[in-house]
Design a protein with these regions (language model features):
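Subtilisin-like peptidase catalytic core
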Residues: 234-313, 356-359, 455
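Active-site core segment of subtilase-fold serine proteases
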Residues: 74, 171-176, 180-256, 260-267, ...
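Active-site glycine-centered loops adjacent to acidic/histidine catalytic or metal-binding residues
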Residues: 200, 336, 417
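Autoinhibitory propeptides
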Residues: 3-4, 10, 93-175, 216, ...
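Extracellular S/T/G-rich loop segment that most often corresponds to the catalytic His/Ser-adjacent loop
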Residues: 344-434, 486
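Loop/turn elements at helix/coil->beta-strand transitions in domains of secreted/extracellular proteins
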Residues: 58, 192-195, 269-274, 299-304, ...
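Secretory targeting signatures
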Residues: 1-41, 322, 502-546
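C-terminal subdomain of the subtilisin-like protease fold in secreted/lumenal serine endopeptidases
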Residues: 303-305, 352, 434-515
Length: 546
């Protein structure tokens, strides 16, 4: 057998050493970028909303740009930062073009979803003109949103004592139905340390049961706890808390109201209440809601409560909801008051905890919206949306008939609607986060939905009963009626189990992936072996050359 030349042997030995290292640790990614290059943007034509007018007066158009690619493993704070940085960099060419063009006016920019609101003179500018920008993906209308239409007449009372009179309980029926006080007693918490942002018609801070958060009690604008947004999503400077209707004060009271009458009205009365005015009386816009959500995320809101929406499936709400959730906020939304086989956005977005209504007996009222949603029914949904092919809304139901809460002017009011149900769930989320501050939105959602209970057999649910209406029950109740105590117990147990698993073993990840980490013992050992072999070969080679 021919011998290997002495000059080649060291090289082969070195190659063998480093191949040994490579086989031990596998491929290692260099840097934080994906190994696969992202496709060039702008390959596909932009999607123009068919509802956008193409002639006549100026039109408010929302121009949507490519969303940031946020790795799942990064934290909430870094997610927010990356969203803002990405929006700023990708929007600049469009903004420069709009500011220098006749027929275009920049009204607002957004980062929670990568979007710019423009006023467009359709006689001077075609929507297709935006296709010149590779980052632009779609153009759609500034969708109108509103408070879900009230299902029946609302009875108001001027006196809190009168509104709550006759009750032998020290909580409203709704709090008892979701077992809020059981959480108070078992876990010694009423929502302390948790921030809930209600986005609605405003709030009356003069109400004795409403305590709005503020960074400066001497400042009448309630900095950090209050914000008002106009129809374009612009922050209204110098705004002080007020309610343009009655809806926002009522919803806020159910989330975190007090008990000055002796009867508690709020699920999480010690939670920090934030309020963003995004509806004037009952109506608002997509831009207002997104601006309010951005503000809530910036204020480190742990939960965002949305008792509003637009009937139908409106894909523009998908990215704001999932980005808010990725930024650490639980998003809760009402399904609407249009009855079976209907729902509204953003409540019907998969990442929202969608909430329908029940009465005090556990029956779903006829007005409560719910349906099975096929993903293909969403027009222009994000291609990377992870919603399943089919899912049901609501996720859960909560008290939404004759719900008593605060009313502007210091009184109390009984109101129906899924708008009243949603804040019961937002308050429940606050209780859970007070117990487990590090719980993720996914963990909160799982705890709330998987512990919800169905009513006893025979309870009327729309046109069916629990005894024989399984298909209808699914779209009327979702997982069932929210049970705050059961959800708290499940969350605590799940996190304890997770902590025990981490402490007693290792992660659930593929051990081969851990071996490829530059900080892993396998990686370090492999490097040391390769370096040692290299040094030994070089030393021997030098000796042989002497």
């Amino acid at each position: 057998m021919p011998s290997v030349r002495s000059g080649t042997a060291p090289v082969l030995a070195l190659v063998a050493a480093w191949l040994l290292l490579a086989s031990a640790i596998g491929p290692v990614a260099l840097g934080s970028d994906s190994a696969t290059a992202a496709p060039e943007s702008g390959d596909d034509p932009i999607v123009v909303d068919a509802d956008l007018p193409t002639d006549g007066p100026t039109v408010e158009a929302v121009v949507r740009l490519e969303e940031a690619d946020i790795p799942a493993e990064i934290g909430a704070d870094e997610t927010e930062q990356r969203l803002e940085t990405h929006a700023e960099s990708t929007q600049e060419p469009l903004l420069e073009y709009a500011r220098g063009s006749d027929g275009l006016q920049v009204e607002e920019t957004f980062w929670l979803t990568n979007a710019v609101l423009l006023e467009v003179d359709t006689d001077a500018v075609d929507y297709e003109a935006f296709d010149r920008f590779g980052a632009v993906e779609a153009v759609h209308e500034n969708v109108e949103v509103s408070v879900p239409e009230r299902p029946d007449r609302v009875n108001a009372t001027a006196s809190g004592a009168a509104a709550l009179a006759g009750s032998e309980r020290r909580t409203t029926t709704g709090l008892a139905q979701v077992n809020a006080t059981d959480v108070w007693d078992a876990y010694d918490t009423r929502g302390e340390g948790v921030r809930v942002a209600v986005l609605d018609t405003g709030v009356d801070t003069g109400h004795p049961d409403i305590d709005l958060a503020t960074d400066d009690p001497s400042d009448p604008t309630y900095p950090g706890g209050w914000a008002e947004f106009d129809a374009t999503g612009g922050r209204v400077p110098g705004s002080t808390p007020h309610d343009t209707g009655t809806h926002g004060t009522h919803v806020s009271g159910t989330v975190a109201g007090g008990a000055t009458t002796g009867t508690a009205i709020g699920v999480a009365p010690e939670a920090e209440l934030l309020h963003g005015l995004v509806l004037t009386d009952t109506n608002g816009s997509f831009a207002q809601v997104v601006a309010g959500m951005e503000w809530a995320v910036r204020q480190d809101a742990d939960a965002i409560s949305l008792s509003l929406g637009a009937t139908g499936k409106h894909a523009p709400f998908i990215d704001p909801v999932r980005n808010a959730r990725d930024s650490g906020a639980v998003v809760v939304g009402a399904t609407g008051n249009d009855g079976p086989e209907t729902s509204g956005s953003p409540g019907n977005v998969y990442e929202t905890i969608s909430v329908g209504a029940v009465d005090r007996n556990g029956a779903v009222p006829s007005f409560s919206s719910g349906q099975r949603i096929d993903r293909t029914e969403w027009t222009a949904a994000p291609p990377d949306w992870t919603a399943p092919p089919s899912y049901v809304v609501p996720d859960v139901v909560a008290p939404g008939v004759a719900v008593t809460s605060a009313a502007p002017g210091g009184g109390y009011r009984s109101m129906p609607g899924t708008s009243m149900a949603a804040p019961h769930v937002s308050g429940t989320a606050a209780l859970l986060l007070s117990i487990e501050p590090n719980a993720t939105p996914d963990e909160i959602t799982t705890a709330v939905t998987e512990t919800a209970r169905m009513p006893a057999a025979g309870i009327v649910a729309g046109d069916t009963t629990t005894a024989d209406g399984t298909a209808t029950l699914e779209t009327r109740y979702g997982h069932g009626i929210v049970d705050a105590k059961a959800a708290a117990d499940a969350l605590v147990a799940a996190r304890r189990s997770s902590d025990d698993a981490v402490a007693g073993n290792a992660s659930d990840s593929d051990p081969r992936e851990g071996a490829r980490s530059p900080s892993s013992p396998v990686f370090v050992a492999g490097v040391l072996v390769a370096v040692s072999l290299t040094l030994a070969v070089l030393a021997r080679y030098r000796i042989g050359r002497r």
